[in-house]
Amino acid sequence: MHIGIYINNENISSVDCKNLLAGNPGIGGTEYCVLLLAQVYKMYYSNNKVTLFVAKQGILPEVDNYVVVNGIDDLPAKAQKEDVDVLVVSAVYNGIPL
């Protein structure tokens, strides 16, 4: 199974999010939970592929792949190109509910 997880990390790309098990590094609750999901899912289901779709390259948790997308409108095409089976998207984008 290939899981894709999207996060708009534009405002937190400079924050070290490599080890979220140590706690929230001050990135906000939703962002923390989304990135923690990617990290923990990969830890427990190491045979599954995890791709993080992000707005900016950053200091991110260890997963199989990172794909930079140009906004949420770019996400479906990139996810399809990466052959993602399940795509997780936060219900909030730039502070606005989807």
Feature map (PLM): residue ranges:
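Extended catalytic core of nucleotide-activated donor transferases of GT-like folds
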Residues: V40, F53-L98
